[in-house]
Amino acid sequence: MNDVLDLTCDLIARASVTPEDAGCQALLAGRLTAAGFACEHLRLGEVDNLWATHGSGAPVLVLLGHTDVVPPGPREAWTSDPFDPQIRDGVLYGRGVADMKGSVAAFVVAAEQFVAAHRAHAGTLAVLLTSDEEGDAIDGVRRVANLFLERGQAIDWCITGEPSSTERLGDLLRVGRRGSLSGTLTVKGVQGHVAYPHKARNPIHLAAPALAELVARQWDDGFESFPPTSLQVSNIHAGTGANNVIPGELQVAFNLRYTPHWDAPRLEAEITALLDRHALDYALRWHRSGEPFYTPEGRLRSVAREVLGAFAGAPPEESTGGGTSDARFIAPLGAQCIEVGPVNASIHQVDEHVRVADLQALPALYRTLIERLLIE
C-alpha cells in the first residue's frame, strides 16, 4: 500500500455513520498538526467539525469534505464487511471510500506534500471537515459558515471532494448545484362513507386539480449549465386502508430542485398562491435544504478545467447536476466553489468502491490544483 491507501483504509475502518465521526478528525488533525497546520476542533451540538489552516492572508483556498458516511444497510448484503476495507482486483471496497473518505485522505496527503514543498506559500490553505453532511446538515458546515461570517473569515476558493467523476477520474467538473426545497402539504376534508359523498369532502378530489397544475408547470428553461427547475411529488398518503371510507385528510410530500432563476421564498410564495386559488383548506410545511450556487468563468474554474483535462486526457464536462453538497453553505460567503472527486457509480450502495489507481492519483490531482492556485 501507499500513504493515501493506508489513510483511506484507516478512515473506512472507523464506522462513522452520520453524525458520528468515530475519531476520523482526530486522526487527520494529528497529521495536519504535524505538517504545520493550526487545527481548531469545533464541536457543535452532536457534530464534530475541523478547521485546519496553513499560511495567512489572501487568497484563501479551502478543501472541503466530510468524515461521516451513510448507514451500510444489511451487512450480509456486502461481499465483505463495509467497515473492513478490502482490495480485490485493483478495487478498494468499503463504506465511504467514494463518498468521501478517499477524497478526504487525498486532501490531507496533498496538503502535507504541498506545505512540505512550499513552506512560505502565498495565502492560506485550509481544510474544513464535518461529520454532519450525510444527515441533517444543521450543526456542520451550515453552522461553521455562520461562525465564519461572525469572524469575518473570507474564503476565495473552495474545492469539495464529492465524488463528481462519472466514468473515469476527472471526466466531470461540478461548477454549481441546484437549490433544494421540500414541502409537506396537508389538505383537510371531511371523512365519510363512500356511499354518501354528499356528507363528506374528499381531500383527494379537492386537491387533484391543484396537484395537476403543480406537476404540469414549467418553472423555467434552465440557466447556463443548469437543467430546468423540477418539482417531483415523492409521497402521497390518505385514507384508513378501507375502501369504503372517504379520507378526512391528504398528505403530499414534494421536492423542488431549482436553478438560480429562483430562491426559496419566491417558490414558496408561488406555490402558496396556487393552492389559495384552488380554495383548499390546507397546511404547508417547508424545509429549505440550500439555495443554488454557480461558479462562473474565473481563475478557479479555468485552472480546474486545465488540470482535470490533463489527468483525464480530455476536457471535463462542466455540470451542475446531482444532489446537494456542503458547498452550498460556503458559496454565500462569496467563495467560488467547484467539486472534484472520484467516480460516483457506487456511492450509497452495497459494495461501495473506488479503483485503487484512481485513489493513488487523487493526491497529485489535488496538489496540482493547490499549486496552480497558490503558487502561480
From Swiss-Prot:
Which residue positions are annotated as catalytic?
68, 133 (proton acceptor)
Entry EC number(s): 3.5.1.18
Q: Which pathway is this protein assigned to? A: Amino-acid biosynthesis; L-lysine biosynthesis via DAP pathway; LL-2,6-diaminopimelate from (S)-tetrahydrodipicolinate (succinylase route): step 3/3
Cystine bridges: none
Give the catalytic activity: N-succinyl-(2S,6S)-2,6-diaminopimelate + H2O = (2S,6S)-2,6-diaminopimelate + succinate
The EC category is: hydrolase
Annotated residues that bind Zn(2+) 1 are located at: 66, 99, 162
Instruction: Mention one GO molecular function.
Output: zinc ion binding
Q: Which HAMAP family match?
A: DapE
Q: What PANTHER family does the record point to?
A: ACETYLORNITHINE DEACETYLASE (PTHR43808), N-ACETYL-L-CITRULLINE DEACETYLASE (PTHR43808:SF31)
Function of the molecule: Catalyzes the hydrolysis of N-succinyl-L,L-diaminopimelic acid (SDAP), forming succinate and LL-2,6-diaminopimelate (DAP), an intermediate involved in the bacterial biosynthesis of lysine and meso-diaminopimelic acid, an essential component of bacterial cell walls.
Member of which family? Belongs to the peptidase M20A family. DapE subfamily.
Question: What is the protein name for this chain?
Answer: Succinyl-diaminopimelate desuccinylase
What is the species listed in this Swiss-Prot or TrEMBL entry? Xanthomonas oryzae pv. oryzae (strain KACC10331 / KXO85)
> What's the source species' lineage?
Bacteria, Pseudomonadati, Pseudomonadota, Gammaproteobacteria, Lysobacterales
